[in-house]
């Protein structure tokens, strides 16, 4: 995905060298982190590795996406029907338990109400049940501990002002 982002940046007119995507092994990454020629570090991955890299960055700007909180950004010019369908299946398929499940949706304020309506319609259409049954999209959580964790997240969100919509 990161390599594709680099290709898209070039196609969009970012000059060569303006954005560098450097997938590499740990030893090389750590040398790049301390190299003063690089002004920004962007890292997606585990919290343990991200915080270790941040400690080594010194005064560089750092953007960390840690712990698997896969985010989706919905802009006003997006195909909202397509985005709502993909966010619904991406967030609820396999009960949201894969490392690439949609866990956050960032929506431009000008389309937030419309997108929310479309997303709720898509989520309501998802079939829940036994994962071995054909057509089931939303199966059970893996164990009681996982269910308790989800209930805790919901309670925390509500305590901070969120509303349960479905």
Annotate each predicted stretch with a short phrase.
Residues 2-3, 35, 151:
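Conserved strand-to-helix beginnings and helix N-cap segments that scaffold or border functional pockets
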Residues 12-13, 33-40:
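Short, surface-exposed connector motifs at secondary-structure boundaries
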Residues 18, 40, 46-166:
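ALDH superfamily catalytic-core signature
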Residues 29-32, 148:
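Short, solvent-exposed polar/charged micro-motifs at secondary-structure junctions
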């Amino acid at each position: 995905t990161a390599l594709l982002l680099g290709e898209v940046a070039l196609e969009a007119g970012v000059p060569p060298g303006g954005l560098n995507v450097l997938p590499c092994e740990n030893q090389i990454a750590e040398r790049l982190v301390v190299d003063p020629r690089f002004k920004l570090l962007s890292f997606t991955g585990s919290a343990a590795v991200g915080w270790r890299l941040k400690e080594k960055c010194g005064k560089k700007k750092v953007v960390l996406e840690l712990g698997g909180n896969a985010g989706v950004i919905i802009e006003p010019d997006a195909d909202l029907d397509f985005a709502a369908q993909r966010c619904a299946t991406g967030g609820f398929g396999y009960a949201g338990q894969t490392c690439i499940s949609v866990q956050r949706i960032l929506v431009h304020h000008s389309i937030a109400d419309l997108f929310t309506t479309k997303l709720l319609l898509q989520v309501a259409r998802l079939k829940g049940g036994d994962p071995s049954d054909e057509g089931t999209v939303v199966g059970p959580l893996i164990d009681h501990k996982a269910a308790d964790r989800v209930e805790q997240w919901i309670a925390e969100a509500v305590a901070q002002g969120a509303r349960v919509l479905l």
